[in-house]
């Protein structure tokens, strides 16, 4: 089952900065896509990371250590477990 983890670019950058380029976690995070949303002439950006549940839990553990503000966003994605076909 694939999970779509959707977090703010600031939280994403904070978590990513804790890992070296050789780290498996770095590779998982780098698979994220920056998505631009437009609402009432305002632009909002999010980073979407499509991964399996195991990797989503790894991202959650990293957020708990390095960016507690991102935990709720990631927990919600895991809870919803949106599947893509």
Where are these predicted regions, by residue range?
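Short intrinsically disordered terminal tails
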Residues: 1-2, 79-85
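N-terminal acidic leader/helix
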Residues: 2-28
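Long, compositionally biased, charged low-complexity segments
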Residues: 11-12, 70, 74-82
């Amino acid at each position: 089952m694939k999970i779509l983890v959707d977090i703010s670019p600031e939280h994403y950058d904070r978590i990513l900065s804790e890992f070296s380029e050789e780290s498996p976690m770095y590779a998982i995070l780098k698979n994220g896509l920056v998505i631009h949303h437009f609402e009432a002439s305002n632009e909002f950006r999010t980073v979407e990371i499509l991964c399996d549940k195991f990797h989503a839990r790894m991202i959650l553990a990293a957020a708990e250590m390095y960016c507690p503000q991102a935990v709720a966003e990631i927990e919600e994605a895991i809870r919803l477990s949106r599947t893509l076909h």
